[in-house]
Swiss-Prot record:
GO process terms (BP): amino acid biosynthetic process; aromatic amino acid family biosynthetic process; chorismate biosynthetic process; quinate catabolic process
Function: Catalyzes a trans-dehydration via an enolate intermediate.
Keyword list, A-Z: Amino-acid biosynthesis, Aromatic amino acid biosynthesis, Lyase
CDD domains linked to this entry: DHQase_II
Full protein name: 3-dehydroquinate dehydratase
Classification of source organism: Bacteria, Pseudomonadati, Campylobacterota, Epsilonproteobacteria, Campylobacterales
Site (Transition state stabilizer): R17
GO terms assigned for molecular function: 3-dehydroquinate dehydratase activity
Family matches, as InterPro entries: DHquinase_II, DHquinase_II_CS, DHquinase_II_sf
Reaction(s) this enzyme catalyzes, per UniProt: 3-dehydroquinate = 3-dehydroshikimate + H2O
Similarity comment: Belongs to the type-II 3-dehydroquinase family.
Active site, renumbered: Y22, H99
Protein's pathway: Metabolic intermediate biosynthesis; chorismate biosynthesis; chorismate from D-erythrose 4-phosphate and phosphoenolpyruvate: step 3/7
Length: 166
């Protein structure tokens, strides 16, 4: 069960940038907390951060065939990037969008997320704890998908066995 965590522009500045909005926690600590959860729950987690839209698109595309799910904070690109939205849609992987702040309670231009339209869910406004919530949700989603695939494979095997006996 592999999850790729993709962090967008300026998130490398957490702990320094606008602490009244984003708090004092650095991105490295958020990632360490996520890794701890992953280790405790049999998950593999990979982290990626970029300030460049094209690099984020490339990373999303690289997830196809390599990851089971994506947790993404597109940051400011949430509101503007059709390219990131289309990349998420193209890979068809369970994707959860995270925002540290409640984007719906901020400036008007931040209230609509293009990328949320293709995400399985959005977690916003819980500070760094939102990433932990995303890990819990992704674990549940991937566990359910795994159980479904297992049940389908079992049903298919039983159907083939039944066809052989006929």
């Amino acid at each position: 069960m592999k999850v790729v965590v993709i962090q967008g522009p300026n998130l490398n500045m957490l702990g320094i940038r606008e602490q009244r909005l984003y708090g004092p926690m650095k991105l490295e600590q958020i990632h360490q907390n996520m890794k701890t959860f992953a280790d405790q729950n049999g998950m593999e987690v990979e982290f990626f951060q970029s300030n460049l839209e094209g690099e984020i698109v490339d990373k999303i595309q690289e997830c196809l065939g390599d990851a089971d799910g994506i947790i993404i904070n597109p940051a400011a690109y949430s509101h503007t990037s059709i390219a990131i939205r289309d990349a998420i849609s193209a890979v068809s992987l369970p994707t959860l969008e995270v925002h540290i702040t409640n984007i719906h309670a901020r400036e008007e231009f931040r209230r609509h997320s293009l990328t949320a339209e293709v995400a399985a869910g959005v977690i916003a406004g819980f500070g760094p704890f939102g990433y932990h919530m995303a890990m819990i949700a992704m674990h549940q989603i991937l566990s359910e998908l795994g159980a479904l695939k297992e049940a389908q494979a079992k049903a298919q095997a039983q159907a083939q066995e039944g066809a052989k006996e006929s």
